[in-house]
């Protein structure tokens, strides 16, 4: 899924768990992708390209069991929950951040071709909806999702514009008929990974900047019945 729409998922997390600060939530929704970038640059995971790259379906996420397998994401989310909920004694934060981490693989399963493994060491079967086999439809669906996140969050028009413009900016990557610099990525998967890393950062910064004034930073703003972390009382 386009990085800006993963970033937009943070808006849903804030709507459900408003007591969690903006930066940890933004980092959590893209933690899986940060690992993917690092593992590709280090050669631990492998991305390949067709001799000519015209759109995203000419780039193949050939081997990514450590960052993008279902089991690896579950372990990563549980680790985040244990560290935050148990060691830092912030159970609501831990739950929110674990859900944020898990959201990444859920959204990728909804859009990717069959390139997501069940677990490291299990190469088959691989999972994905296959939506990226029809790139323009994928971009349309992704953009709708980003706009829906904005609507649930009740964000500003500037935030909406950021989400829409980031998606439109990716149009050459989703539409082979629209000229763009994507052809330069042929045979250069590590450059592709580095570009994705930069794109992630820009997306997170943009969403964070334009959402910050409406970010629900007080647990008192949580929906009725939602748990909130409270400071411990001495002697209890």
Identify the meaning behind each predicted range.
Residues 1-236:
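N-terminal membrane-targeting hydrophobic helices
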């Amino acid at each position: 899924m386009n990085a800006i729409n993963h970033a937009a998922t943070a808006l849903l997390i804030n709507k459900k768990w408003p007591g969690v600060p903006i930066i940890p939530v933004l980092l959590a929704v893209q933690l899986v992708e940060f690992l993917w970038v690092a593992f590709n640059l280090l050669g631990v995971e492998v991305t390949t390209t067709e001799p000519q790259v015209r759109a995203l379906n000419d780039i193949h996420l050939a081997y990514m069991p450590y960052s993008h397998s279902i089991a690896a994401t579950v372990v990563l989310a549980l680790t985040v929950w244990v560290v935050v909920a148990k060691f830092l004694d912030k159970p609501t934060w831990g739950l929110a951040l674990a859900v944020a981490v898990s959201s990444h693989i859920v959204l990728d399963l909804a859009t990717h071709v069959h390139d997501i493994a069940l677990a490291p060491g299990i190469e088959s079967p691989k999972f994905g909806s296959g939506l990226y086999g029809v790139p323009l439809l994928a971009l349309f669906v992704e953009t709708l999702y980003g706009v829906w996140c904005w609507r649930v969050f009740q964000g500003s028009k500037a935030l909406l514009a950021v989400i829409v413009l980031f998606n439109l900016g990716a149009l050459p990557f989703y539409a082979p008929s629209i000229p763009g610099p994507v052809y330069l990525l042929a045979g250069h998967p590590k450059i592709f990974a580095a570009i994705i890393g930069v794109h992630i950062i820009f997306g997170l910064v943009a969403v964070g900047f334009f959402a910050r004034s409406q970010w629900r930073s007080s647990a008192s703003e949580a929906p009725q019945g939602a748990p909130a972390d409270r400071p411990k009382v001495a002697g209890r």
